[in-house]
């Protein structure tokens, strides 16, 4: 009787899994665009932010392929499909404001929360949480128990491998984006980003009217 119950339980589990909507990503599921990562070298914070605390000042930055997320009903899958774009050059995923997609532990909020991570090299990385590291795999909802990574970039490994290079074992960026200059450094500050644009933010544009003469420069600058 006990054996029969075990068999029935296995059948029930298998049947349940069979109804979970899993789906392999296709090109029609995501948007493709261009992200200029060079602007991160002199990145200016656009939004107001407040201290989120550094849960671990680690430098390791691993990665995962976004196509590993296949549960269509999950917050991760839905958020990626609705809000993220794949950079056809670097393979990084980014949102409408240029925040890079990454997996973070529960210490750093929920899916869709955004952060500024400042590195020891002075670099500011705008990060949006698009996947959640399992609490079973991280210490204190923070760093991965095995590799110590706080930030795990969510990427398209095909494009990223071509752009950042691969090691002999096939790992993108030799398995650690800390090997890439723009991402090199340990975390010295983490800030939670709000939706409010900072009053000190100045956006520079390149499409200035070249036909403005000296007499009208004052009126142009005044908005008349």
Q: Where is each model-derived feature located?
A:
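Gram-positive cell-envelope targeting signals
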Residues: 1-34, 223-224
């Amino acid at each position: 009787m006990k054996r029969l119950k075990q068999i029935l339980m296995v059948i029930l589990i298998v049947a349940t899994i069979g109804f979970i909507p899993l789906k392999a990503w296709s090109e029609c599921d995501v948007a493709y665009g261009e992200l200029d990562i060079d602007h991160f070298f002199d990145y200016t914070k656009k939004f107001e932010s407040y201290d989120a605390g550094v849960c671990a000042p680690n430098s390791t930055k691993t990665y995962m392929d976004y196509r590993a997320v296949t549960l269509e009903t999950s917050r991760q899958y839905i958020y990626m499909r609705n809000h993220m774009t794949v950079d056809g050059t670097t393979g990084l995923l980014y949102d409408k404001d240029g925040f890079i997609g990454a997996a973070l532990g529960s210490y750093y909020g929920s899916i869709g929360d955004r952060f500024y991570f400042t590195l020891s090299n002075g670099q500011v990385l705008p990060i949006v949480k698009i996947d959640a590291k399992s609490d079973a795999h991280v210490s204190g909802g923070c760093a991965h128990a095995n590799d110590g990574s706080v930030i795990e970039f969510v990427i398209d490994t095909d494009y990223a491998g071509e752009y950042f290079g691969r090691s002999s074992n096939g790992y993108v960026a030799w398995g650690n984006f800390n090997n890439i200059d723009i991402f090199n450094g340990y975390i010295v500050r983490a800030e939670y980003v709000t939706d409010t644009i900072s009053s000190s933010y100045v956006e520079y544009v390149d499409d200035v009217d070249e036909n403005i003469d000296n007499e009208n420069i004052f009126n142009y600058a005044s908005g008349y």
